[in-house]
Design a protein with these regions (language model features):
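Short alpha-helical DNA-recognition segment
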Residues: 51-70
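Signal for well-folded cores of large energy- and translation-related assemblies
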Residues: 26, 48, 89-92
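Short, amphipathic alpha-helical "recognition" segments used to contact nucleic acids or chromatin
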Residues: 36-52
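Short, solvent-exposed alpha-helical "recognition" segments
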Residues: 75-81
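N-terminal flexible/basic segments that precede or flank functional cores
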Residues: 1-41, 105-116
Length: 116
């Protein structure tokens, strides 16, 4: 008889999360963390779309090659949102900031909308 491995033997349940994994994990500044991740993703996507090396991307964005490497690994701890926005602009991307009043009067959120 075949022995079940531990994964097969356990009942696994899933819970639907929100659109923000950082909020689901209970982290402080979850909106800011998600915005940083989205900005980093946009930088990495544009670098790949252009077929740039890390050195070429560094020259274009004004960042260092090691900065580009860190962003490629989604390590955002050394980067302000302003610095990432500037890198995107230097890559030829428009960065728009839109402010809306919440209908329910609750605290606002911070979101990054990327082109599809």
């Amino acid at each position: 008889m075949r022995q079940k491995n531990k994964r097969e033997a356990e009942d696994v349940t899933f819970e639907l999360g929100s659109e923000n994994v950082f909020a689901d994990l209970g982290l402080e500044n979850a909106d800011g963390l998600l915005a940083n991740a989205d900005l980093t993703h946009a930088i990495n996507t544009e670098i790949r779309a252009r077929g740039m090396t890390q050195v070429e991307a560094a020259e274009r964005t004004g960042l260092t090659q090691s900065d580009i490497s860190r962003l490629g690994k989604m390590k955002t701890d050394r980067f302000s949102q302003e610095r990432m926005q500037n890198a995107l602009r230097r890559l030829g991307m428009d960065v728009e900031i839109r402010i809306n009043r919440r209908a329910d009067g609750g605290p606002g959120t911070l979101k990054v909308f990327q082109p599809k």
